[in-house]
Curated annotation (Swiss-Prot):
Pfam families to which the protein is assigned, alphabetical: RNA_pol_Rpb6 (PF01192)
Organism this protein belongs to: Corynebacterium urealyticum (strain ATCC 43042 / DSM 7109)
Catalyses which reaction(s): RNA(n) + a ribonucleoside 5'-triphosphate = RNA(n+1) + diphosphate
Gene3D superfamilies: 3.90.940.10
EC number: 2.7.7.6
Role, per record: Promotes RNA polymerase assembly. Latches the N- and C-terminal regions of the beta' subunit thereby facilitating its interaction with the beta and alpha subunits.
Record text on subunit structure and interactions: The RNAP catalytic core consists of 2 alpha, 1 beta, 1 beta' and 1 omega subunit. When a sigma factor is associated with the core the holoenzyme is formed, which can initiate transcription.
Organism phylogeny: Bacteria, Bacillati, Actinomycetota, Actinomycetes, Mycobacteriales
Keyword Glycoprotein: no
Keyword tags: DNA-directed RNA polymerase, Nucleotidyltransferase, Transcription, Transferase
Name of the featured protein: DNA-directed RNA polymerase subunit omega
GO CC annotations on file: DNA-directed RNA polymerase complex
GO biological process: DNA-templated transcription
Amino acid sequence: MENQDVNSNETVFDPPVGITNPPIDELLTKVSSKYALAIFAAKRARQINDYFQSIDEGVLEFVGPLVTPEMHEKPLSIALREINADLLEHTEG
């Protein structure tokens, strides 16, 4: 959504919505390719999701989030923040 600034001719955009924090460009410096990032983040998001499900079942056999999750934050967003904070080590293969 764009708005026109009253005092100038500049166009002002609303803040972006979606996975923009951390920025994808920063995340790509931590892995070899965008495909590796997608697989790495998806696997970690699955582990986080399994952890939250195991809490509901009373069984704690998975590693939970390594960063403090925000309210209603999705597992993929948590995984991307962990990758950006260098809390996880990515190995090829």
